[in-house]
UniProtKB/Swiss-Prot annotation:
Main location: membrane
Family to which this protein belongs: Belongs to the PRA1 family.
Domain of life: Eukaryota
Name of the protein: PRA1-like protein
An individual GO BP term: endoplasmic reticulum to Golgi vesicle-mediated transport
Keyword Transmembrane helix: yes
């Protein structure tokens, strides 16, 4: 009975940690109105101003930027359905092989070992994966993420209150 109570306690602690981290992550989200305020968009005067804006906006809008990157990942997978199918086959294949729990697969008169199943899965996934062009998708994803995130961070002015915060810290 004590082992059961220990495992329940451990599970509840894990869920509370996940909930706390999720709450902390969600508390970092800024409203859409604040994130997309077009009145605060302007071209930086020089590179150092752009650098300071990027630094400030990364710390302020990090949760929003992660959400944008997640949406771009979802869009990239929807845009490349073959890659999504290859990922599904890979995950399903590994799940099926692990479900055997190390036992060999018995097909009528043929026995296939666990290692051979992984080799067969790799032989199927590598050509399909190359045909699905994952490198192109990754390069597009990196480029689109950089343009969206760095573009917003560089052109979005920090609020006026942030200037007073730095003065207060100096005093």
């Amino acid at each position: 009975m004590s082992a059961l109570s220990l495992s329940i306690t451990k599970v509840s602690e894990t869920f509370s940690e996940i909930y706390a981290s999720r709450a902390q992550y969600l508390s970092g989200f800024k409203s859409v109105g604040e994130f997309l305020d077009v009145r605060r968009i302007s071209r930086p005067r020089n590179f150092s101003e752009a650098q300071s804006r990027i630094s400030f906006n990364f710390s302020r809008f990090s949760s929003n930027y992660l959400a944008i990157i997640a949406m771009l990942v979802i869009y990239a997978l929807i845009r490349n359905p073959l890659l999504l199918i290859v990922i599904g086959i890979g995950v399903g294949g590994v799940y099926g092989i692990r479900k055997l729990q190390g036992a060999d697969l018995q097909l009528s008169h043929r026995v296939i070992s666990n290692q051979n199943l992984y080799v067969i899965l790799a032989c199927v996934l590598i050509p399909l994966g190359l045909f699905a062009s994952p490198i192109e998708t990754i390069i597009w994803l990196v480029g689109a993420s950089c343009v969206c995130v760095f573009g917003h961070a560089a052109f979005f002015e920090p609020p006026v209150e942030s200037a007073f915060e730095t003065v207060e810290q100096q005093v």
